[in-house]
């Protein structure tokens, strides 16, 4: 096969898969909504089952559900027949995947699920199959033929099933109000998790935070700055509200202007209305704010604008967020 023929064949495979996805797009109906509602109201786990290529797809869908706010596990139907059926509970919901709808092992799982009154969502290419008959809701895989030259190897059907699973998971994620913070809790390691770490995961609190009052002498303010090691201190008023910040840069500018620290108060040197960040905001947002304003520290404040922590650029870089 010449290279141009090889590439054309590969493109044809992809075109067939695109056609399958387009058919899926136009076929979504009230059954999809019913399936999502069952899963949304599930008080237990969402169990995914399937065998062969359908099993691989089911395992991936289960993983996606778990990582986006819907507790889920994969149940291998062959293992289920040898004791793992005990995983099923009456509070669970079951998604069974079989393109033919006649996989014997999967049907055994469905029979047991029905005995426990577990709602069953069947994903199949055959609406007249045994799987469809056992299911409370049927989601049809609208595939005319596979991309395989012999119309045998699961290709279009597996792609469409995976896309349908993603649509289910993402819809549930949206309905449940699953947030970036929720995502970060489930992905603490790796690039995704690091990028979604929050300020409160990294900042310094309590006695570590340098704070002085606006009438504090500059001698005391400098001692506070050097003792805490951040090269800065928050400045608060009598009510404890943040009114400014003093950094190494402020000290240099004050000296360059000919200023003297003798009889000078913190309020005379501080930068008013400093840049701040909230503890529940993304640490990556804090880094961007530092870069945009050419600063290395941010005071962390609560809703009352009271300083509750401090975040240094080194803390963020050490966490390898970017």
Curated annotation (Swiss-Prot):
- Indicate the segments forming the CBS domain, all copies: 203-261, 270-322
On whether Isomerase is a keyword of this UniProt record, the answer is yes
| Keywords, ordered alphabetically | CBS domain, Isomerase, Repeat
Q: Which domain of life is it from?
A: Bacteria
InterPro entries from the entry? CBS_dom (IPR000644), CBS_dom_sf (IPR046342), GutQ/KpsF_isomerases (IPR050986), KdsD/KpsF-type (IPR004800), SIS_dom (IPR001347), SIS_dom_sf (IPR046348), SIS_Kpsf (IPR035474)
Molecular function GO terms recorded: carbohydrate derivative binding; isomerase activity
Carries keyword Repeat?
yes
- Which residue ranges does the record assign to the SIS domain? 35-178
Gene Ontology BP annotations: carbohydrate derivative metabolic process; carbohydrate metabolic process
Q: Which family does it belong to?
A: Belongs to the SIS family. GutQ/KpsF subfamily.
NCBIfam families referenced in this protein's UniProt entry, alphabetically = kpsF
- What's the protein name? Uncharacterized phosphosugar isomerase aq_1546
Task: Provide the species name.
Answer: Aquifex aeolicus (strain VF5)
